[in-house]
Curated annotation (Swiss-Prot):
Protein name as catalogued: DNA mismatch repair protein MutS
NCBIfam families xrefs: mutS1, PRK05399.1
Species of origin: Clostridium botulinum (strain Alaska E43 / Type E3)
Name of the gene encoding the protein in the UniProt record: mutS
Similarity field: Belongs to the DNA mismatch repair MutS family.
Residues that, per the record, bind ATP: 613-620
Taxonomy of the source species: Bacteria, Bacillati, Bacillota, Clostridia, Eubacteriales
PROSITE patterns tied to this protein: DNA_MISMATCH_REPAIR_2
The keyword ATP-binding is assigned to this record: yes
Length: 941
């Protein structure tokens, strides 16, 4: 059986857009067929039906009314689907045969703007990633605002992932030949829709790129920036089915001009969303975003995501905030005007996309009405930033006047319903309106006349789109109708509808006038829209100034409300904060209840602050507080402190909190080590590093060794030595102060009471001598008998603890800055093992065992002699292996330094042997111990 002609056309269109859900217009509905119908029915919970399409079985089908599409499409796009809208391109009444249809738009996660959502303060970025030789190239665009920018950088995977984390695009385009490993890592950072294209074929020409932007902008592109820009423009044109005039500026930027914050650090610092709820509330953005406009909200988020690292730029923004901060009346007047401004950027985007309506243009007019007032307020400002805003703000008087003269104050909802153009703007519109008005008056007069003539008081003249005008008389009055006066038109359950020749003639006149008026108003509206479209560059420029001005005004307002101060900025490595506060925590618990703290970091004696103290005492909050104050200062904001002098940081890294990647097969400890490794590889001497509880995911001594080794790596590596806050439970590490350069002990103050402790939340100089873990457990409500037993166990363990950091700190350090046990320490352990074995009194052992299961031993003396001989040979091999390992690492470059886990494993193995109490083992236990030693030794080879 063959498909019906309509389904043949459908299949052709579907084949062209096979990666999309096809919304196929049939009359007043969008219909979906086959797999699309199954998907949409499942995702939108719609009834699945069927349609005869010429095949043996009915095709699965579901549909939605065309006027309700705006409610359904966002739900599909949010789930990561693309939707192709196929419309009827001709009037079905006038077509012969199959109605001509075509796809008018493809809606994807990266190109969809939902004006009804609550995310108007967020950008919707579409990103293209390309690789060219040894560089990554990126291009991105938000078509709703017209933003289009590109950058490139060395082929360093972490830089790419950091940029993706920062931009948070809704959709990513990659080349077909991208490696699966890189694709997986991108998905791990941001699970969004990724579309593959052949970048050799899917791109516009250089001439098309120049036509969209300018010869000057395009000629300045390197090849690694040109390719993704061409691909991005191609994708936008393909999905929008038109060239967007609001995308008219191609910006280039360098990632090194902004602070680098990796994805983990953004999450740990809760910059734009909280870790727990994944919402804006509880984040830094939640505290700072008191913006008056949607544009200002997007700008503030961008400033948080991209702190500056150029001193002049930071101080320029700070000076602007300071001027507004010092003039409360000025800021109140400014914000009063800003609150009347709509989202000009996105209105301009609608104008460009040809989907703007009359209400949007009214919103634009209202916004432009406020520009002269804002310019007047800026006239007497003195800071460089605000003066620049004053000089460059275009009031757009001509555009405002055009809108004021042409668009009605209460326009109709739809462009094809009329009632858009103001009286007096067009003579013909005025004439047609008069004709329409007279027609309505004639209808009212007809109704009164017929009521009097027939004596039927309930008679009425009505109208609907199907039957036109009619005279309606209830059936109870049917006998009162004069014979031959009316022509029956429609019969209802309780009434009859009629017409007269006179009414039919007038209907043609009235409806003719209405149709002409609607068509005329629409054509005039299009002319007005096109005139405004020519001024898009001016509109975008003023919108950018308004959004930046709103950002400055908001930062000044937040500083005033929360008692923030202007920070000083330096480049000499000094971070000095007096009475610093966590901006989010103090907002949640109240400023009066928050305990402020001082911070002093420098490049001499306070390079690494080693912070000890119990859980729940505030160590993590304090560390995040320092990072947030630094970030706020570099974004140009005032900060929560009584004074602050902040050295510019190129990067912020954090390793805070416990997390795992079970799906990726990574334990909590493995994830922790990966994060630490990433920090040690990528931090510089100008970075700020926050490390919280490094090593807690493994055994005590392993964790202590790793934590200690990391501290050494940071402080002794001349290429690193970054500003570091290092919080730990290992209070044994406090002895590193004075041994390692730049290490300074701090702790959380604790007040000891008779049966409990009080955490004072105050960071003070000096290390903690205990962890108070049992007190925290008590606060958490553990049973009293558990607490008491824990105290007993703690006392017993502490009495047996022989860990001596001074002994370890005297050991030599290999070239990779990782502390290893020196040769003499190894020898001591070996001697202990041999001594234990040689002092065995074989006469004390007497046992029986199964001769079939183990080798026959002639005498107990020979058994122990063999055991001792083996242990000596194993220790000798370990000595030789350790010597070779040390020599290998001595020759290694400092640039490739890594924590030596292999050596640590061997050290643990030797310690395990030395702890064996051979004197108390029977022959069977001795043989089992020997077997385990051999097995473990082989694993270390």
């Amino acid at each position: 059986m063959a498909l019906t002609p309509m389904m043949v056309e459908y299949m052709k269109t579907k084949e062209e857009y096979n990666d999309c859900i096809l919304f196929y217009r049939l009359g007043d509905f969008y219909e979906m067929f086959f797999d699309d119908a199954l998907t949409v029915s499942r995702e939108l919970e719609l009834v699945l039906t069927g349609k005869n399409c010429g095949l043996e079985e009915r095709a699965p089908m579901c549909g939605i009314p065309h006027h309700a599409a705006a409610a359904y499409i966002p739900r599909l796009v949010t789930k990561g689907y693309k939707v192709a809208i196929c419309e009827q391109l001709e009037d079905p009444k006038q077509s012969k045969g199959i109605v001509k249809r075509g796809v008018v738009k493809v809606i994807t996660p990266g190109t969809f703007i939902d004006s009804n959502s609550n995310l108007e303060n967020d950008n919707t970025y579409l990103m293209v990633i390309s690789e060219h030789e040894d560089k990554f190239g990126i291009a991105m665009s938000d078509i709703s605002t017209g933003e289009f920018k590109t950058t490139s950088f060395n082929n360093i995977k972490m830089s790419l992932l950091d940029e993706i984390s920062k931009v948070s695009p809704k959709e990513i385009l990659v080349d077909n030949n991208i490696s699966e490993d890189l694709l997986e890592e991108i998905n791990n950072v941001l699970p969004v829709l990724i579309t593959k294209k052949d970048f050799n074929e899917f791109l516009v020409s250089k001439e098309e790129l120049i036509e969209q932007f300018s010869d000057l902008e395009v000629s300045g592109l390197t090849i690694e920036r040109e390719i993704p820009s061409k691909v991005l423009l191609k994708y936008i044109n393909e999905t929008q089915k038109m060239s967007l005039t609001n995308i008219n500026l191609l910006e280039q930027y360098e990632i090194i001009n902004y602070m680098t914050i990796d994805g983990n650090s953004r999450r740990n610092l809760e910059l734009t969303e909280s870790i727990r709820e994944k919402t804006k509330k509880g984040s830094l953005l939640w505290v700072l975003d008191k913006s008056a406009t949607s544009m200002g909200g997007r700008t503030l988020r961008k400033w948080i995501d991209e702190p500056l690292i150029v001193k002049d730029e930071i101080e320029k923004r700070l000076s602007g905030v300071e001027e507004v901060f010092n003039s409360i009346g000025f800021n109140e007047d400014l914000r009063s005007a800003l609150k009347e401004i709509y989202d000009i950027e996105r209105i301009v985007g609608k104008i460009s996309n040809k989907n703007v309506n009359a209400k949007d243009l009214l919103s634009l007019k209202s916004s432009l009405d406020k520009l002269p007032c804002i310019k007047k307020l800026l006239k007497d400002t003195s800071s460089e930033l605000l003066k620049g805003y004053y000089e460059n703000l275009d009031e757009l008087i001509d555009v405002r006047d055009l809108l004021n003269d042409s668009i009605k104050e209460d326009p109709g909802l739809g462009l094809k319903e009329g009632n858009i153009i103001k009286d007096g703007y067009n003579n013909l519109v005025d004439e047609l309106r008069q004709s329409k008005l007279h027609g309505k008056e004639w209808i009212a007069a007809l109704e009164n006349r017929e009521r009097e003539f027939t004596g039927i008081k309930s008679l009425k003249v009505g109208y609907n789109k199907v039957f036109g005008y009619y005279i309606e008389i209830s059936k109870s009055n049917y006998n009162s109708i004069p014979e031959g006066r009316y022509i029956r038109k429609q019969t209802l359950a309780n009434a009859e509808r009629f017409i007269t020749e006179e009414l039919k003639v007038m209907e043609d006149k009235i409806l003719g006038s209405e149709e002409k008026l609607i068509n005329l108003e629409y054509s005039i509206f299009v002319e007005i829209r096109d005139k405004i479209e020519k001024e898009i560059s001016r509109l975008k420029k003023s919108a950018r100034i308004i959004s930046d001005l709103d950002g400055i005004s908001t930062l000044a307002l937040v500083a005033l409300e929360n008692d923030y101060i202007k920070p000083e900025i330096n480049t000499n490595g000094l971070i000095k904060i007096t009475d610093g506060r966590h901006p989010v925590v103090e907002k949640v618990i109240g400023k009066g209840d928050f305990v402020s703290n001082n911070t002093a970091l420098n490049q001499t004696d306070k390079e690494l602050l080693l912070i000890t103290g119990p859980n729940m005492a505030g160590k993590s909050t304090y560390m995040r507080q320092v990072a947030l104050i630094t970030l706020m200062a570099q974004m140009g904001s005032f900060v929560p402190a009584t004074s602050a002098n902040i050295s510019i940081c190129d990067k912020i890294f954090t390793r805070i909190g416990a997390s795992d990647d079970l799906a990726g097969g990574k334990s909590t400890f493995m994830v922790e080590m990966w994060e630490v490794s990433n920090i040690l590889k990528n931090a510089t001497s100008n970075s700020l590093v926050l490390l919280d509880e490094v090593g807690r995911g493994t055994s005590t001594y392993d964790g202590l060794s790793i934590a200690w080794s990391v501290i050494e790596y940071i402080t002794k590596n001349k290429n690193l030595r970054c500003k570091t806050l290092f919080a730990t439970h290992y209070h044994e590490l406090v002895k590193l102060e004075g041994i390692l350069p730049g290490v300074k002990n701090y702790s959380v103050a604790v007040k000891k009471l008779k049966d409990s402790v009080v955490f004072l939340r105050k960071i003070v100089e000096g290390g903690a001598d205990e962890s108070y873990g049992i007190e925290v457990a008590k606060l958490a409500g553990l049973p009293e008998n558990v607490i008491n037993r824990a105290r007993e166990i703690l006392e017993d363990l502490e009495s047996k603890n022989t860990f001596d950091i001074n002994k370890l700190s005297s050991c030599s350090m290999v070239s990779n800055n990782t502390k290893e046990i020196a040769a003499d320490s190894i020898k001591n352990e070996e001697d202990k093992v041999i001594s234990n074995a040689q002092n065995i009194d074989v006469n004390e052992t007497n046992c029986n065992y199964n001769e079939e299961k183990i080798l026959k031993i002639e005498t107990q003396n020979s058994e122990y002699e063999e055991t001792i001989k083996f242990l000596k040979s194993e220790i000798k091999e370990l000595q030789e292996s350790n010597k070779k390992h040390n020599k290998k690492h001595k020759d290694a470059s400092n640039d490739n330094m890594q924590i030596n886990f292999e050596v640590m494993e061997k050290e643990n193995f030797i310690k395990e042997i030395s702890d064996v109490d051979i004197l108390n083992l029977n022959p069977m236990e001795a043989m089992n111990t020997l077997y385990k030693v051999v097995t473990d030794a082989k694993k270390l080879q």
